[in-house]
UniProtKB/Swiss-Prot annotation:
Subcellular location: Golgi apparatus; Secreted
Listed GO MF terms: ferric iron binding; ferrous iron binding; ferroxidase activity
Residues that bind Fe cation 1: E52, E87, H90
Catalytic function, reaction form: 4 Fe(2+) + O2 + 4 H(+) = 4 Fe(3+) + 2 H2O
UniProt xrefs under CDD domains: Euk_Ferritin
Record PANTHER family: FERRITIN
Pfam families: Ferritin
InterPro entries for the chain: Ferritin, Ferritin-like, Ferritin-like_diiron, Ferritin-like_SF, Ferritin_DPS_dom
Record gene name: Fer1HCH
Protein name (database record): Ferritin heavy chain
SS bond partners: C41-C150
Binding site for Fe cation 2: E87, E136, Q173
Entry keyword annotation includes Iron: yes
EC supergroup of this enzyme: oxidoreductase
Length: 211
């Protein structure tokens, strides 16, 4: 009996101090002088993040479409799944930038309010490539609008963000648009000459397979 009481007392001795020493961290006040991004610039960046996530979801839908057994175009599927990953990475880069500038300390959930893909099927590869090119053009225009909002602010010209978007994002966008336009042109020429077989050949070339 005494041994049971000793064990019980030992448990209490361990548990009570543990509950008494729980870590309660009070909020701290940090100077805000270093947070210099203005509202119009910040809001346009948040909208751009949503657009990048939306583009990623649309590319996922495109990849899923070309992965269907009744479509079976693995080259196109891989192309669009890779594009989805790139758009997601763009969104992550923008989020990381805002965090570096002291933003996104609250109301992060609004960034997740993204509309679902507008389309889920395409007649063929040409239509899908042209849709992708149109979507990338819209993303490029949106980035230019962000640059304008952050550059033309009468109170604060955000040179650093403008330089970041111009150097890292716009160049990649322009190269991506040119690549999609070239792919669409090549596919159209193949299909003009070989009809449906042309799309099959092009799909294999996307996988690096010579036919």
């Amino acid at each position: 009996m005494n041994s049971i009481l000793l064990v019980f007392a030992g448990i209490l001795a361990v548990c009570l101090p543990a509950s008494a020493t729980q870590c309660n961290v009070n909020p701290v006040q940090i100077p805000k002088d270093w947070i210099t991004m203005h509202r119009s610039c910040r809001n346009s960046m948040r909208q751009q993040i949503q657009m990048e996530v939306g583009a990623s979801l649309q590319y996922l839908a495109m990849g899923a479409h070309f992965s269907k057994d009744v479509v079976n175009r693995p080259g196109f599927a891989q192309l669009f799944f890779d594009a989805a990953s790139e758009e997601r990475e763009h969104a992550m880069k923008l989020i990381e930038y805002l965090l570096m500038r002291g933003e996104l300390t609250n109301d992060v959930s609004s960034l997740l309010q993204v509309r679902p893909p507008t389309r889920s099927s395409w007649k063929g590869g040409v239509e899908a490539l042209e849709h992708a090119l149109s979507m990338e053009s819209d993303v490029t225009k949106s980035i230019r609008n962000v640059i304008k909002a952050c550059e033309d602010d009468s109170e604060f010209n955000d040179y650093h963000l403008v330089d970041y978007l111009t150097g890292d994002f716009l160049e990649e966008q322009y190269k991506g648009q040119r690549d999609l336009a070239g792919k669409a042109s090549t596919l159209k020429k193949l299909m003009d000459r070989h009809e449906a077989l042309g799309e099959f050949i092009f799909d294999k070339k996307l996988l690096g397979i010579d036919v």
